[in-house]
Amino acid sequence: SAASDVYKRQAEVEEEKRKICKSKVDSYDLSRLWEASDDIRSLKSLILFGIKGMAAYAYHALVLGKTDSEVNSFFYTALRAIEGESDPDKLLSLVLKTGEVNFRCMALLDSANTENYGNPVPTVVPLTIEKGPFIVVSGHDLHDLKLLLEQTEGKGINIYTHSEMLPAHGYPELKKYKHLKGNFGTGWQNQQSEFHNIPAPILFTTNCIMPVRQSYSDRVFTTSVVSYPELVHIGDDKDFSPVIAKALECGGYDEDKEMTGMNGGHT
């Protein structure tokens, strides 16, 4: 039943938390947030959703060797407020602080990205998928993309970004790879229809994955902080051999496939 699936997933999350959490903490019952008054619920939701996005950027910066003590400490400040603060004025102040620290975190990630991959430049990105084996990379972890580009170089496999990975084409140290060919499809919200019967593997590097449909489930791989039940996960060794093997097995399209972007264009 749906209820049993929810309880099973909650148990899996608790087990994962025990594995990765370095301190003993009690779980917060999120239903408490939704039971609060409209104003308190809205303010706390803004804070919660703000730090969720910030956590992803902070993680990517950390992978590239960049950290910020103010950003890190704010996670604790925000979570404590979500758990126990009930003063709307204090929460509003914290909402504004969330935006401020988010901006600081984005600057941190920008610094990490540009130091490793160069300053991005305006780039025309093709939306045509060339015939032959290819891999689609979704999410926004540039480090994972770089490692995949290195491992696929010279193997006759083209690489296409998807959704949030699109900006990768502007970075000199990534665009220098000739087999980084273009972008596949439109936004992450359309992935279930656009990936239908795709003759290639998809690698998800962050949590933009949607419930995977049977028409492409055998071609989906995850890595880093994203995973999905019954899918192959590429671990910390970052050995993308299973993804590469799947790309060669699938073979790609027999002829070039022209796709359109969000604005209806072809680049």
Q: Across the structure, where does each feature detected by a protein language model lie?
A:
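Phosphate/diphosphate-binding loops
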Residues: 179-214, 219-220
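Short connector loops at secondary-structure junctions
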Residues: 161-179
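Short helix/loop capping segments that flank catalytic or ligand/cofactor-binding pockets
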Residues: 144-147, 168-171, 211-215
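Short, small-residue-biased leader/transition segments that mark boundaries at the very start
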Residues: 2-7
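Solvent-exposed alpha-helices and their adjacent loops that cap or buttress functional pockets
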Residues: 19-23, 36-39, 43-46, 102, ...
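A charged, amphipathic alpha-helical module
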Residues: 57-140, 147, 152-154, 250-267
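Active-site cores of enzymes that catalyze phosphoryl transfer or operate on phosphate-rich substrates
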Residues: 206-267
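Structural motif
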Residues: 133-136, 157-160, 200-203
